[in-house]
Design a protein with these regions (language model features):
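Beta-sandwich/jelly-roll carbohydrate-recognition scaffolds of carbohydrate-active enzymes
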Residues: 2-160
Length: 160
C-alpha cells in the first residue's frame, strides 16, 4: 500500500480504517487498544502473504469511489469493472439506544450489493493474531464462520 488516504469508521467502542478499494486494512478487536485483527496496513510488499485482511475484490476493477453518507459515519465504497459491472460496499459500526442507554457493540457491519451489470466479486476474510504474525484458525458453522484469536477474542462473521 502506498497511500495513507484511509476512511475511518467506528462507534466509540471499535474502529476500522478502510482503503479506497474497500479493504479493511486496520482494526483492533474487541477494543481500540487490543490486537489488530485486521492489519494488512502493515504488509510490506504486494507479494507478502495476505493475512489480517477483509477485502471485497471486484474482478476486472478499473476504478473506485468512496464517500460518507451525509451527516453520518456510514462509509460507502463503489467499485466499477471494465464490463460495466459495479458493487457498492457499505461499512459502519452500529451505535444505538437500548434499554434507555447508548449501546456501542464491538461490531462492524459490512454489506456488499451489486448496483450495475453482473459483477464478480471475491471476498477475502483472513483475520490475524499477533499484529499479523499468524492467521486465526477458522471454524465453520451453518451460516457463520468463527475465528478465535490467540488473545482469546473470537471474531464471528455471519452472512445471509
Amino acid at each position: 500500500m502506498s497511500t495513507l488516504e484511509l476512511a475511518a469508521i467506528g462507534n466509540a467502542a471499535v474502529s476500522a480504517l478502510v482503503d479506497a478499494n474497500g479493504e479493511i486494512v486496520w482494526s483492533c478487536m474487541p477494543r481500540p487498544d487490543a490486537d489488530a485483527i485486521f492489519c494488512s496496513l502493515l504488509r510490506g510488499t504486494a507479494d507478502a502473504p495476505r493475512i489480517g485482511c477483509f477485502a471485497v475484490e471486484l474482478l476486472g476493477q478499473v476504478r473506485s469511489e468512496q464517500e460518507y453518507v451525509a451527516n453520518t459515519p456510514v462509509l460507502v465504497t463503489r467499485l466499477f469493472d471494465a464490463g460495466g459491472g459495479a458493487v457498492e460496499i457499505t461499512d459502519f459500526a452500529p451505535r444505538f439506544r437500548q434499554f434507555g442507554r447508548l449501546f456501542a457493540p464491538s461490531q462492524l457491519v459490512r454489506t456488499v450489493r451489486p448496483i450495475a451489470g453482473s459483477p464478480r466479486v471475491r471476498i477475502q476474510l483472513r483475520p490475524a493474531s499477533g499484529y499479523g504474525r499468524e492467521p486465526c484458525a477458522r471454524i465453520a458453522g451453518s451460516n457463520h464462520v468463527r475465528y478465535p484469536s490467540e488473545g482469546g477474542y473470537v471474531l464471528r462473521a455471519t452472512t445471509d
